[in-house]
Regions:
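Surface-exposed charge patches
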Residues: 53, 93, 123
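Long, charged N-terminal interaction/targeting segments
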Residues: 1-63
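Flanking helices and flexible, charged tails adjoining ferredoxin-like Fe-S electron-transfer domains
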Residues: 2-3, 69-73, 113-185
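Ferredoxin-like iron-sulfur electron-transfer modules
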Residues: 5-16, 37-45, 65-87, 92-93, ...
Length: 185
């Protein structure tokens, strides 16, 4: 196997961020492949074409898709049954590209052009109002670079929100500790 950087491997992955490979996203999977810790056949969205591209890059023989990770399917997108959606917002956080829009207690919708088809929104939905459909308008996977960029933005926003929450909690704790028992500073 030729020594290749993870970024070169990541460039060949479909950027669905689906985690079906067993890793937290496409880049962690690419890093595992580069380190020799993962096989090249664990990406169902990439299918045989993706496996062949990885094999060529790494100078190894292609392998059949590891079906324990799933099967290759045509690109599908999430569709929300808006009449059944209760607006719980549990599907928003798992979406790696922020393709689902909505607010708590309001119906949600999917921006089809941003959906990678990862299926990560399905399990958290308590009313099973999300289904996957082949999108005739977008039969081929969206632009990988755009999907990667949206995922990176999503991740940075989540990390920023987490950091701000922790700072707010620390500030509140300091305020409580700085007051005497009567609420005076």
């Amino acid at each position: 196997m030729i020594s290749i950087h993870a970024i070169d491997i990541d460039a060949l992955l479909p950027q669905t961020q689906c985690t079906k490979c067993g890793y937290a996203g496409c880049m962690p999977y690419a890093e595992a492949i580069a380190a020799g810790d993962a096989a090249i056949n664990r990406c169902p969205p990439g299918g045989e074409t993706g496996i062949a591209a990885l094999a060529a890059l790494l100078g190894v023989a292609p392998l059949p898709l590891d079906v324990s990770c799933g099967t290759h399917q045509p690109h599908r997108i999430a569709v929300i049954d808006e009449a059944a959606c209760i607006g719980c917002a549990k599907c928003l956080r798992p979406c790696p590209t922020d393709a689902i829009v909505g607010a708590n207690k309001f119906m949600h919708s999917v921006i089809a052009s941003l959906c990678t088809g990862c299926e990560l929104c399905i399990a958290p939905c308590p009313v099973d109002c999300i289904r996957m459909e082949i999108d005739p308008q977008h039969p081929v996977m969206m632009n990988k670079d755009a999907a990667r960029e949206r995922f990176q933005l999503h991740t940075r926003r989540f990390e920023r929100d987490q950091r701000e929450r922790l700072e707010l909690l620390a500030e509140r704790e300091r305020a409580v500790l700085s007051t005497d028992g009567n609420g005076h500073g």
